[in-house]
Amino acid sequence: MNSISALFSAGGFQWILLSLSLAFIVVYSLFYLAVGLYNLYFHPLARYPGPLLGRASSLWYARSLARGTVAQDTLKLHEKYGDVVRIAPDELSFIQPENWSAIYGHQLGKDYRELIKDPRYHDTVKPTPTILTGDWDEHTFYRKILSNSFSEKSLKDQEHILHHFVDLFVQRLKETSAEGTRELNMTDQWNYLTFDVIGFLTYGEEFHCLTSSKLHDWIEAMLCVAILMSLGQAARHLPFPFDKIYKQWAIPSNVKRQVALHRDLTEVAIPHIPIQYASAYRLNSRKGDIPYSVLKEHANILTIGGSETTATLLAGATFHLGKNPPVLQKLATEIRTTFVNDGEITVARLSECKYLLATVEECLRIYPPSPANHTRMVPKEGIVLNDQHIPGGIGVGMPMYAAFRASSNFTYPDRFAPERWLGDPMYSKDKKGALQPFSFGPRNCLGRHLAYQEIKLALAKLVYHFDLELNPKCGDWDEQKNFTFWVKPPLWVNLHPVKS
């Protein structure tokens, strides 16, 4: 009896806890060591190359996501290991152009219509079915509703809205640039424009970012939602219990606050969504009015997709044009000789400007607004990619940044050269089909035509009215972290108004 009492005395109890803890650590370590060895030598993907840590565990991918360098890191892996890389035990990364169709296209003649999205991506956001997160039927249903707003007729009817905001953008630049003597942060300026445009198109009211020269609170909050999604993905690649610990303690508190703010701002804005959007839903829905949660999530999707990605591309275009004066001069000459005055610049006539179109394509290639992987899951029966059978349950994807910047796809991939899209023989071996900046297949970006119109119009009017000069301190501006979207620093530019 005394020995039992001694065992459970303070010192004895601590010894038991220590022993159990050590035993747990040993068993835990041995378990994951065994898993790692299995992944390296016996897993169905064991033959695929990749970093040792990435082949053995998900830690490489989790670390890369958490650091915000997954786009650049994946490119480095492809340059080292080739066109197919194993970036996690159960995930393969591809960069060959033909795999856009194989992974993201319609799966004709199969028992399934598409490769579904990796649930680890959407587990970090609310499970409300939307055009992004819904299954095939849900996606098709919502896409049909929204497609009317992005039809050729609707875009033509809305062109005057683009002109209104782009003209206001040019006016504000003239007022604030002080004849080119004052530096402007074009990262913010482009966000002012694109957020005002999408705010009006989505909610039927202006957010007055251009007139106030102030970013709406929603912008920062919206970007924090994107950061949360990336960090949530990182957590899901960690083993238990570190996934729970990471989500609880490693995600910055300011990110959580901004996500809450984003939710509150959405609640305020929802009542102002144009009635034609809700009416379209009622017309097509068999269940009556659109659920509030679905309406709210689609408002978020339209706002994020229609503002941040377009602003990112325009900022990237400004940077690369500033870094490459000969390209800027060619573009300015084309625009200024094609149009006698500003009033002649229309979306239809901009299709005549071949160098402008090539410049936009090259910007999308060298600085894609959505740089990272969009993983799909292989169905249980498996698929064939690169003449190799990929078993069910494996994640596969085409990371845009890696595919667009790979030396196996593009000649001098780090060179900003619109000429590669104009038949220059120097770039004749480019695999131009690798460039799919709006994704591919039935889930490609619904707003891509609107984005092209806004980008072409804004860029054309910028170079028509201004000579731009990039501040040398922004020479490495494009070396950015990415958490779903790029985290863009200030882009300081002097704008010199062109004399009439």
UniProtKB/Swiss-Prot annotation:
BP GO terms, sorted: biosynthetic process
Gene Ontology terms for molecular function: heme binding; iron ion binding; monooxygenase activity; oxidoreductase activity, acting on paired donors, with incorporation or reduction of molecular oxygen
InterPro entries the record matches: Cyt_P450, Cyt_P450_CS, Cyt_P450_E_grp-I, Cyt_P450_sf, Cytochrome_P450_monoxygenase
Residue positions the entry lists as glycosylated: N99, N185, N373, N409, N482
EC number: 1.-.-.-
GO cellular component labels: membrane
Alphabetical keyword list: Glycoprotein, Heme, Iron, Membrane, Metal-binding, Monooxygenase, Oxidoreductase, Transmembrane, Transmembrane helix
Deletion consequences: Abolishes the production of heptelidic acid.
Entry binding sites for heme: C445
Protein location: Membrane
Gene3D superfamilies in the record: Cytochrome P450
Tagged with keyword Zinc-finger: no
Transmembrane parts of this sequence: 15-35
Cofactor(s) needed by this chain: heme
Membrane topology qualifier: Single-pass membrane protein
Keyword Transmembrane helix among record annotations: yes
PROSITE patterns linked to this entry: CYTOCHROME_P450
Pfam family, one: p450
Pathway, per record: Secondary metabolite biosynthesis
UniProt-listed SUPFAM superfamilies: Cytochrome P450 (SSF48264)
Entry's family note: Belongs to the cytochrome P450 family.
Protein's job: Cytochrome P450 monooxygenase; part of the gene cluster that mediates the biosynthesis of heptelidic acid (HA), a sesquiterpene lactone that acts as an inhibitor of glyceraldehyde-3-phosphatedehydrogenase (GAPDH) and a growth inhibitor of the salt-tolerant lactic acid bacteria in soy sauce brewing.
Protein name: Cytochrome P450 monooxygenase hepD
Species for this entry: Aspergillus oryzae (strain ATCC 42149 / RIB 40) (Yellow koji mold)
Lineage of producing organism: Eukaryota, Fungi, Dikarya, Ascomycota, Pezizomycotina
Gene designation: hepD
